[in-house]
């Protein structure tokens, strides 16, 4: 196994990364899998060096084990790291994967008739997002998303009403036949 470190922007996303790639037995390293799309993205963004690289510092630095496969065999016996640009892109992609997963889970729960709070709690537990308190953040995210949908719908209805009003302009028909 080859090792690389990834600084993650948020503790919530650190927990989500642990959900995507479970730790190996007896180790704190996450085992990256190429079966997951984000795993493929991680592997594709690895940079190699012929000399040792410094380990990133911070609270949310994750140690990843990269499996030896056909596509990673040229990484063996080299020092692996992520560039600052790739760390930024990977964090943005991880957030997008999280958002899509949450939105999909939430929508399926709503479609089945479950309450919003129950869906969010089930998502937190199923994804093992318990080392931080993501409840408020997810409730706020859901609220903002619903607010955007309501505003979009209100704008659509206002445009539709305006169109109908203009098409039915009756200003020239003020006389009533007797």
Predicted regions and their residues:
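Positively charged, polyanion-binding regions of nucleic-acid-associated proteins
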Residues: 91-112
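Short, charged amphipathic recognition helices of the HTH superfamily
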Residues: 107-127
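Short Lys/Arg-enriched helix C-cap and helix-to-coil transition segments
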Residues: 149-166
